[in-house]
């Protein structure tokens, strides 16, 4: 009787180990996977791609909205890199989306400072300067309605406390 109990206990342990293996599959890595491009930085299928002020911008349409992936390089600052191309002292766009990677510092004309660190949903009001914090590029997935973003998203037209 003791032998049959030992056999039953051994079968139970093996069955439990098999269930555990099925519940937590091992990740398989291959040499090919190791050289893959990071999906946050890979080209977006079907998007229009352009660079402006050192920012890599990819834009696609989703109904009436545009979906944009913006990659800001380490060292980027709006007032240095974009101001000459845009011609305004501050960024006058509203930004609504998801900060997928990196950290950004936002400063408004009234001196108010906001910092965002990934992963985070962001809503940045018009009238700001901003820059990348640290040595990692910033990746933002943004939704906009071209010149109608503020109204369509319910954002204020200027920074408020």
Locate the predicted segments by residue.
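Catalytic core of non-heme Fe(II) oxygenases with the double-stranded beta-helix
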Residues: 77-91
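Ligand-binding loop in jelly-roll beta-barrel domains
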Residues: 125-150
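Conserved GNAT-family N-acetyltransferase fold
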Residues: 70-72, 97, 122
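A short, N-terminal "cap"/entry segment at the start of jelly-roll beta-barrel domains
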Residues: 2-71, 76-80, 155-161
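Short acidic-glycine-tyrosine-enriched beta hairpin
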Residues: 108-127
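Short beta-strand segments
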Residues: 68, 112-114, 139
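Short, conserved beta-strand element in jelly-roll/cupin
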Residues: 88-106
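Short beta-strand segments in beta-sandwich/barrel cores
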Residues: 77-78, 102-107, 130
């Amino acid at each position: 009787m003791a032998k049959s109990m030992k056999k039953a206990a051994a079968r139970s342990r093996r069955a439990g180990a098999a269930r555990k293996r099925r519940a937590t599959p091992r990740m398989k890595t291959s040499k090919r996977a190791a050289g893959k491009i990071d999906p946050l930085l890979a080209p977006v299928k079907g998007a229009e791609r352009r660079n402006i002020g050192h920012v890599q911008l990819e834009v696609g349409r989703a109904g009436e909205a545009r979906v944009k992936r913006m990659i800001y390089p380490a060292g980027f600052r709006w007032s240095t890199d974009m101001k000459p191309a845009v011609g305004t002292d501050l960024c006058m766009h509203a930004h609504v989306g998801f900060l997928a990677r990196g950290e950004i510092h936002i400063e408004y004309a009234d001196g108010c400072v906001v910092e965002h660190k990934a992963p985070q949903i962001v809503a940045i009001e018009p009238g700001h300067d901003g820059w990348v914090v640290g040595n990692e590029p910033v990746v933002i997935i943004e939704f906009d309605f071209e010149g109608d973003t503020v109204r369509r998203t319910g954002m204020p037209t200027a920074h408020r406390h």
